[in-house]
UniProtKB/Swiss-Prot annotation:
Transmembrane segments: none annotated. It catalyses: 4-CDP-2-C-methyl-D-erythritol + ATP = 4-CDP-2-C-methyl-D-erythritol 2-phosphate + ADP + H(+). Keywords: ATP-binding, Isoprene biosynthesis, Kinase, Nucleotide-binding, Transferase. The keyword ATP-binding applies. GO terms for biological process: isopentenyl diphosphate biosynthetic process, methylerythritol 4-phosphate pathway; terpenoid biosynthetic process. The active site is at 16, 141. This is 4-diphosphocytidyl-2-C-methyl-D-erythritol kinase. Catalyzes the phosphorylation of the position 2 hydroxy group of 4-diphosphocytidyl-2C-methyl-D-erythritol.
């Protein structure tokens, strides 16, 4: 008797933090060349995929004001469907927990989970390299989530090397203001000539003197970024908070001795509308075991 195909699959999509973000150049086509360390964290969305008999991609509970053309999980499903030239259907239900426009990579992670999940659900047998190449068409951060491990990332996001990081806790604050990435990278005052560093250079001092080249521009465009940085600095003196990605979320590495009750009280005292969470670093994407490297 032949094995019945799997009918549904649920994946957790982790957010990420940029422990630093340097812009080291710009290509003739306008794309910026970056260096960063991407840290996976346990702030997750949930992607549920279900086979349907119709030959279509169906999204239930869509995000308000996000069209199917902009919806990364829909685009990811259609992309892999077209690439493999298959007549199969899927219903996608996305439960959002990671704030949108926060610099935490939630949309890219959801797209990666959709590609990984459909590769399993539809028995496509695509390897990690193929999935990553498809993911890059959706966004520069998608290949990292398909790679599935903490990484030193270069180029436009496609050069990814595994990096070993200690398990740490972080305080992450989102001041509830999305910053369009394009507004950061098109700004004439953005630093574009940061001297490149090496993995060893980062590991020699992973917690101190790490900066985000997008932060100064983001603070000018979005005053809430500076407000959030100041709030964390006052709440946790000496924590050296910085922005993640192109903003507007900021984060600080927590001292293991920080009292949990103090942290809970801090989160209760956040300015109205802000979102805060204490998160734990992850070593791997929860979907890592579904990804074939062959």
């Amino acid at each position: 008797m032949s094995k019945q195909p799997q009918q549904s699959l649920t994946l957790r999509s982790p957010a990420k933090l940029n422990l630093f973000l340097h812009i080291v150049g710009q290509r003739p086509d306008g794309y910026h060349l970056l260096q960063s360390v991407f840290q996976l964290i346990d702030w997750t969305d949930t992607v549920h995929l279900k086979r349907i008999p119709e030959n279509e991609v169906r999204r239930i509970n869509p995000i308000p004001d996000v069209s199917p053309e902009q919806d990364l999980v829909v685009r990811a499903a259609k992309l892999v469907k077209d690439f493999c030239k298959i007549d199969l259907g899927v219903e996608i239900d996305l439960k959002k927990e990671i704030p949108m426009g926060a610099g935490l990579g939630g949309g890219s992670s959801d797209a990666a989970s959709t590609l990984i999940g459909l590769n399993t659900l539809w028995n496509l047998d695509l390897d990690k390299k193929t999935l990553s190449n498809l993911g890059l068409k959706l966004g520069a951060d998608v290949p990292f989530f398909i790679f599935g491990q903490n990484a030193f990332v270069e180029g436009i996001g496609e050069q990814i090397q595994e990096i070993s990081l200690e398990n740490r806790d972080f305080l992450v604050i989102f001041p509830n203001r999305a910053i369009p990435t394009v507004s950061i990278f098109h700004d004439p005052e953005l630093t574009r000539d940061h001297a490149p560093i090496t993995i060893d250079g980062f590991l020699a001092s992973p917690l101190s003197n790490q900066i985000n080249d997008c932060q100064a521009v983001a603070m000018r465009i979005c005053p809430e970024v500076k407000q959030a940085l100041d709030w964390v600095s006052q709440a946790l003196p000496g924590s050296a908070p910085r922005m993640s990605g192109s903003g507007s979320s900021v984060f600080a590495v927590l001292d293991p001795k920080t009292d949990s009750v103090k942290l809970e009280n801090l989160l209760q005292s956040l300015p109205k509308g802000w979102i805060g969470r204490v998160v734990r670093g992850l070593n791997k994407n929860p979907a890592y075991n579904l990804i074939s490297s062959d």
